[in-house]
């Protein structure tokens, strides 16, 4: 029913093209392209639809015209195809030097579209992640404490300063291993341990493979043997651990 109404109520395609030498020019002197078959048909139907529905939006009108054009049969499109061909030949005769040049987009429109785009990338780069900064700080402090070469010169100097200060002071036994000597032999052994700043007693309660102590063979340097031989602590050599 839509197709019959469309073909029956439409005027003839020959009534579309106006006469005159400037029939395809605008007021600014711009030469328009010749109309194709759909443009010829839609020009007639648009006027009719706007007269029936004056409050209808232009986008809705164009959408409705496109759907109705697809529903038309090929036999119904033949008159509009012929009219479009006639307009093309007339356009070539009136404007032989015409070349189609599409309009370029103005810079003001491009700047407006760029200003509307969200700036999510800039916000992500400006705000650092707290998790990453915390991981970086923790890893650098750990490497600086365990290995001064990786941690930098300042960390290495601070570690050396702490070692010198601790060696200058009286050596203190850790709280979990500090015991009061109960016999003269243990007192002499305790005094011998105080003589060397790098000698620490072994914590026998910790398993050997716990990772907190290092295992060394039961031998030492001649200098240490001479130091121990005077105090009578040769029997307790295997119980000592030397940290370098």
Swiss-Prot record:
Expression across tissues: Expressed at a low level in embryos, and in the adult lung, ovary, skeletal muscle, testis, brain and heart.
Pfam families the record matches: HMG_box
Places the protein is found: Nucleus
Main localization of the protein described in the UniProt heading: nucleus
Residues covered by region (Disordered): 1-22, 101-137, 152-193
Segments passing through the bilayer: none
Any one of the GO CC terms: nucleus
Database matches in InterPro entries: HMG_box_dom, HMG_box_dom_sf, SOX-12/11/4, SRY-related_HMG-box_TF-like
DNA-binding region: 31-99
Coiled-coil portions: none
UniProt keyword list: DNA-binding, Nucleus, Transcription, Transcription regulation
Protein name as annotated: Transcription factor Sox-12
Annotated organism of origin: Xenopus laevis (African clawed frog)
